[in-house]
UniProtKB/Swiss-Prot annotation:
UniProt source species: Methylorubrum extorquens (strain PA1)
UniProt GO BP: tetrahydrofolate interconversion
Pathway(s) it belongs to: One-carbon metabolism; tetrahydrofolate interconversion
Protein known as: Formate--tetrahydrofolate ligase
Gene3D superfamilies named in the record: Domain 2, N(10)-formyltetrahydrofolate synthetase (3.30.1510.10), Formyltetrahydrofolate synthetase, domain 3 (3.10.410.10), P-loop containing nucleotide triphosphate hydrolases (3.40.50.300)
Amino acid sequence: MPSDIEIARAATLKPIAQVAEKLGIPDEALHNYGKHIAKIDHDFIASLEGKPEGKLVLVTAISPTPAGEGKTTTTVGLGDALNRIGKRAVMCLREPSLGPCFGMKGGAAGGGKAQVVPMEQINLHFTGDFHAITSAHSLAAALIDNHIYWANELNIDVRRIHWRRVVDMNDRALRAINQSLGGVANGFPREDGFDITVASEVMAVFCLAKNLADLEERLGRIVIAETRDRKPVTLADVKATGAMTVLLKDALQPNLVQTLEGNPALIHGGPFANIAHGCNSVIATRTGLRLADYTVTEAGFGADLGAEKFIDIKCRQTGLKPSAVVIVATIRALKMHGGVNKKDLQAENLDALEKGFANLERHVNNVRSFGLPVVVGVNHFFQDTDAEHARLKELCRDRLQVEAITCKHWAEGGAGAEALAQAVVKLAEGEQKPLTFAYETETKITDKIKAIATKLYGAADIQIESKAATKLAGFEKDGYGKLPVCMAKTQYSFSTDPTLMGAPSGHLVSVRDVRLSAGAGFVVVICGEIMTMPGLPKVPAADTIRLDANGQIDGLF
């Protein structure tokens, strides 16, 4: 089979206006970025307010492994399949970060015959949204230091500035820096550092805002520092929000592209799935729901992180509710959860599959605990055996009373996911239960953390280190105790130890630190080491990326 980039380049793309027609979007509502990408105008989106909404389908996954699960590929394949069976469907995805493209090979536009295109533009600069977010964040950083330089009327304590700088690149050298060196004219020297743009709270706010007015209000709530008497200082206090909103105005319009089969996809925003909620923008999701019968979206990492945050943060803030949930699993990944080494995955191993099934089992039960109907999409790999697929379907049927459907969208496009699409429609149009949450926001922050750890992770208890406990007490005192929590832990395990695969139970979830994201509207709970500025590998993908004699990019994918 050809590579992803070869498949994408061989595709004949429709003019973006034709793709927009499928959703009833007129030409005048499009801001074109070439022939195959467009932004959807704010005014058109505002005109959709009050329209009935279609069905929302959430795609999540088991705990990820190096063997790969193919969640984005399944999201695209399912969207194509829904269109094939006569449903007007749109996919809502996150934008890829630029930095990782030059670190580890590969993008985030699906794979095989289930891709969104134009692939290279999507994975690189796209429409410049991340540049706008980087600029807005950088403007805030400049205004903070400028305020301190010119008399510091807010009495900001330079030892307690929480606002770091950002760049959309993997660069470990910028994790910790000294700034304002070189003399009095350059300001007050202090320690600082950079995060990657997707870790910025501006990105999280961007993806949770309902409109421009809500965006500006949320930006104003962001706490960027403390005064010398330990009072919070916000972006509104340093008068940054108006100019930041101006920089983000055009970026807040969702981006329209297409799949290889010419179906519409909205790709907008891309917050970290760890220290943020890991979902595409609310504006894109709402737009999709008001224009299509089915909107298929995904949440970052496994269901313990992505789906939980989608429900407890995004759905709680917006009133959204999925009508069906697809949990993506692979035979390969389940065998890894059952103890098989990656190099041995090609050999049939029913015992390891059954042992690793415990991971899928817990994810299914967790999603059901929110009152949501579930189907398992088994992403097919050519090394899989018929016996392994049959055994997995048997386990799902007998132990979970849930349907598991083998999907071949990577090799066959939408045609390979039609059975999954039919199952999703059956669930979405069937009986619906009220959405429930893992915790109530009225409870203390520590109780919310414990609820997630014990109910969803299988933990016996939580342990909050003294630094985190002190900060939590301060958040409660300052009036932030009713916010939801955003868990930041390893994606590879239900525990905080990435080597504990399967479905560990009885462990302790240790909380090392907490951070306030008042603009986004949650408290980040850090369990273990969380890296907000990645580094490049020993041999980065950038080493082999070039333009060939025909002006095409070589080595990116």
